[in-house]
């Protein structure tokens, strides 16, 4: 990854115009902080993707018991390790790798989860990433009243694509409460992954 104070770029992953993939930009900071305010972290917290550390910093301002992040990128992990040195009062854990591989190996349940990953070209699955993520955490790491807030450019609280034959279909419909709130923010014209003047704070509460 190419990381500076303004953005994170992934030169190994090109778009159709051969531009380095935009992973994250500094304009997102107030939106990320709003996401964490909505999550209202407590207990054991899991984050998917460390990014520029905006959400991690916000999470660790709350009286949580532990903070765990799953992160795949070596350069972002270096940034995480520097950040961790400043966080002396919390139990902080790093799981290095792809969440698609690591979540099935976790033997712990979490109270709060924040999901803001980036595409992983090395993972070849047909399901949308968020759908796959919810399936995996339902099996392994959520408990009654676990809260999930997800980064989103659209007002789709659950953002889950279940087929009519999917065994999760009935279960998910009966076991979650979904909400979505619009967040006004100026998105720069050169951002390729979000457009307009709004982002969305999408929240799921699991009632399993």
Language-model regions, residue ranges each:
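A generic alpha-to-beta junction signature in SAM-dependent methyltransferases
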Residues: 39-40, 63, 140-144
């Amino acid at each position: 990854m190419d990381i500076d104070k303004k953005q994170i770029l992934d030169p190994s992953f090109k778009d159709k115009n051969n531009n380095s993939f935009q992973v994250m930009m500094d304009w997102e900071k107030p939106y990320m902080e709003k996401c964490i305010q909505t999550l209202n972290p407590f207990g054991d917290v899991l984050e998917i993707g460390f990014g520029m550390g905006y959400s991690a910093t916000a999470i660790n301002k709350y009286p949580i018991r532990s903070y765990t992040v799953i992160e795949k990128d070596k350069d972002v992990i270096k940034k995480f390790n520097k950040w961790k040195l400043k966080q002396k009062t919390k139990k902080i854990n790093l799981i290095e790798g792809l969440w698609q591989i690591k979540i099935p190996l976790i033997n712990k349940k979490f109270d709060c989860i924040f999901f803001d990953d980036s595409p992983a070209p090395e993972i070849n699955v047909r399901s949308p990433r968020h759908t796959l993520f919810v399936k995996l955490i339902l099996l392994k790491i959520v408990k009654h009243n676990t809260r999930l807030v997800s980064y989103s450019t659209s007002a789709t609280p659950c953002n889950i694509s279940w087929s009519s034959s999917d065994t999760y279909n009935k279960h998910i419909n009966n076991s979650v409460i979904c909400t979505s709130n619009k967040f006004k923010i100026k998105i720069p014209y050169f951002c390729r992954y979000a457009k307009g003047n709004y982002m969305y704070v999408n929240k799921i509460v699991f009632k399993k």
